[in-house]
Swiss-Prot record:
This is Nicotinic receptor-associated protein 1. It comes from the Eukaryota. Ca(2+) 4 binds at residues 189, 251, 253, 271. Expressed in head and tail neurons, ventral cord moto-neurons, body wall muscles and hypodermal cells of the vulva. GO terms for molecular function: calcium-dependent phospholipid binding; metal ion binding. GO terms for biological process: cellular response to calcium ion; receptor localization to synapse. The lineage of its organism: Eukaryota, Metazoa, Ecdysozoa, Nematoda, Chromadorea. Disruption phenotype: Sperm directional motility defects. RNAi-mediated knockdown causes a moderate resistance to nicotine-induced paralysis and a decrease in unc-38 synaptic expression along nerve cords without affecting lev-1 cellular expression levels in muscles.
């Protein structure tokens, strides 16, 4: 979880992105011929990963915070080069991957690490998320000391020229899909039929095996038909058609109510019915006619000898290779991530002016709420071209109001939940903090239901997907209603991230993050897992009592809370049968409002405080927002 920055954890979802680069109207610095351009790409691997607002004084090739990721060939005598060499980079949705593209006029066909003898032509700095969001990104090159700027409609060429970056997934995830059933399986239960399921295992060269896929359990049958199976061929057999694949058939033994362990432990006492070995090529022969595979139980075979035939038969049919749309397919097709945030203003946070309060505003260090907000927003902003967010507060009394608001717009100045950019969210938060009375209780259901109503309007296509971030310091007061709301929203284009701040015991909150089993209440079961919960305190220090740098905290926190989002989005789209729009005909991308400043928004600097709302100002009313007053609990 707290791995070194820039080192990829093999367990995290990763996609390789291939970048192709061209440039136009470059400066001509040669006297008797045109420039001979070469493009180098760098990634910032240490220090703060935010776009700089100051002039760059140290050449990137000398700056130890930047690591070269590759370089193109030199294109001789050309001001409009189309470089043939491409860059292959790992892409992580949950990370800020800050890149620099720098073009030099090479003074020789061979360019070494020292670039001091080569003329600088231009630079563009951006995060990888910007590139993959547009698929094709064009930008003005910046002069020496500048970082350039993204090309806008109606822009004209500048003296430094422009760069165009094309991004595409290097390789699509290939899966084998097939139907499978069993016939005549051995009976393992004394008083009833077996409860069979299948394990598909990869076999490695050293003979060891690893579980790749498990089917559902089919109760009380010796002739089961399981749901259609889909398995990644790279994971199953490294796409090797002749590599052995192990299939195991087990009879599941039920546990007594309240005794069933979590995770794979609940399969620990199951009885083996039989095993078989096959290959990808053999499975694919089931594309036309059914493939029959005999299950063998070695213990039973040794006991019965020649009388033993098999322990049942597996039949596989409708086999085919499928390539499913990926997260980047949807993003490149214009799918936008709408983002909403809800901040806990209950009294248990402590008086904001007290240094022990979780809302305390220090002059030199952001509080935990600010860290959580910036951590998630700094990633998600690149997937919403409008640069606007919805921001709410909950559990406070607003100015001139007697009742407690279970949900209110964070921007008290304008009385609206819509704010522009990260700066707008942070400014609205600080302003609200100085104008509301912290109260209680901690109710999540009104927030979830409000955002779910918005997500309900997104169900007709793949254009938008909603993410809700809730930051809280305590135990939920309306757990039953919250679970009901989450289950009701589980079929919507919605992911919910909950970050617990402070030192409260959040054990019950883990019930909402149903990684082992889908969330259930009475007879209702969630359609999918849409909640990710983490506690902030796990990220604040290095394990030796020393607080980490805020930038490191934000990076590690974002990595943990956001990595499930791509799978949740693609899982929803698959469930609804939605396909991504073509890259050359994407969903419409809204432009940010005129007041949005991308440079200021990326710095993290504190914006000026908003003024208090005028006397008699009426705040908007949301459904079911007023709750019974409870005394503050500091």
């Amino acid at each position: 979880m707290n791995q070194p920055i820039g080192i990829a954890d093999s367990s995290r979802p990763k996609t390789n992105v291939r970048l192709t680069i061209s440039a136009n109207n470059l400066m001509d610095l040669d006297v008797f011929s045109k420039s001979d351009p070469i493009c180098l790409i760098y990634e910032k691997t240490s220090g703060r990963k935010a776009t700089t607002t100051e002039e760059i004084t140290v050449p990137t090739w000398k700056d130890k915070q930047w690591t070269e990721r590759g370089r193109t060939e030199v294109v001789m005598n050309n001001l409009n080069p189309q470089f043939t060499k491409t860059f292959l980079l790992p892409y992580f949705f949950e990370e800020t991957q800050l890149l620099r593209f720098e073009i030099y006029d090479a003074d020789s066909p061979t360019v070494g690490q020292d670039l001091s003898s080569h003329d600088f032509l231009g630079r563009f700095e951006c995060v990888l998320a910007q590139i993959v969001s547009y698929s094709t990104l064009k930008a003005h090159l910046g002069k020496t000391g500048q970082i350039g700027a993204q090309w806008r409609n109606k822009d004209k060429n500048t003296k430094t020229g422009s760069i165009t970056i094309y991004a595409e997934e290097d390789e699509k995830a290939e899966k084998i899909q097939f139907d499978v059933c069993g016939e005549g399986l051995d009976k393992k239960d004394f008083f009833g039929k077996s409860d069979p399921y299948l394990n598909f295992k990869r076999k490695f060269d050293d003979g060891s095996t690893h579980l790749i896929h498990r089917t559902e359990v089919k109760p009380k049958t010796l002739d089961p038909r399981w749901a259609t199976v889909q398995i990644n061929t790279q994971t199953l057999c490294a796409k090797d058609g002749d590599r052995p694949i192990i299939i195991e058939c087990y009879d599941h033994d039920k546990w007594k109510k309240g005794e069933e362990p979590r995770g794979d432990a609940k399969f620990s006492r199951d009885d083996l019915i039989g095993t078989a070995q096959t290959t990808l090529n053999e499975l694919l022969r089931g594309s036309s006619d059914a493939v029959e595979i005999l299950l063998t139980n070695e213990k039973k075979k040794a006991k019965k000898g020649d009388k033993y035939k098999c322990s049942g038969t597996l039949k596989i049919w409708n086999s085919r290779i499928v390539i499913e749309p990926t997260f980047l397919d949807f993003i490149s097709g214009g799918t936008q991530l709408d983002f909403a945030v809800a901040v806990d203003f209950t009294a248990s946070n402590g008086p904001p002016k007290s240094s022990s309060s979780l809302h305390f505003m220090s002059a030199d260090r952001p509080n935990q709420y600010e860290l959580a907000l910036r951590s998630v927003l700094s990633i998600c902003q690149h997937y919403n071209s409008s640069k606007t967010f919805e921001a709410f507060g909950f559990g406070a009394k607003l100015p001139n109001q007697s009742s407690v608001s279970a949900i209110f717009p964070l921007d008290l100045q304008r009385g609206t939940s819509e704010v522009v950019g990260i700066t707008g969210v942070m400014t609205a938060y600080r302003h609200a903090l100085s104008n509301v009375q912290l109260y209680g209780p901690t109710n999540f259901a009104p927030i979830i239901e409000n955002v779910a109503r918005k997500a309900q309007n997104m169900i007709h296509d793949s254009a938008r997907y909603q993410i809700l971030l809730i930051i809280t310091d305590g135990i939920i007061s309306d757990m039953h209603a919250t679970i009901r709301s989450i289950i009701s929203a589980s079929g919507l284009p919605l992911s919910i991230i909950i970050i617990g701040v402070g030192n409260e015991d959040f054990e019950k909150m883990h019930e909402l993050d149903s990684d082992d089993a889908l969330l259930q209440q009475d007879s209702r079961i969630a359609q999918r897992d849409i909640v990710q919960f983490v506690t902030m305190r796990e990220f604040l220090n290095n394990g030796q009592g020393l607080y980490l740098d805020p930038d490191v905290i934000q990076e590690n926190l974002a990595r943990e809370v956001l990595y499930e989002v791509p799978a949740q989005l693609t899982g929803y789209m698959k469930q609804r049968g939605f396909q991504p729009r073509p890259v050359d005909d994407p969903w419409r991308r809204d432009s940010p409002p005129p007041e949005f400043d991308p440079i200021l928004d990326g710095t993290g600097r504190r914006a000026p405080m908003l003024q208090a709302p005028p006397a008699g100002f009426q705040y908007p009313v949301y459904a079911d927002t007023s709750i019974a007053s409870a005394p503050p609990m500091y």
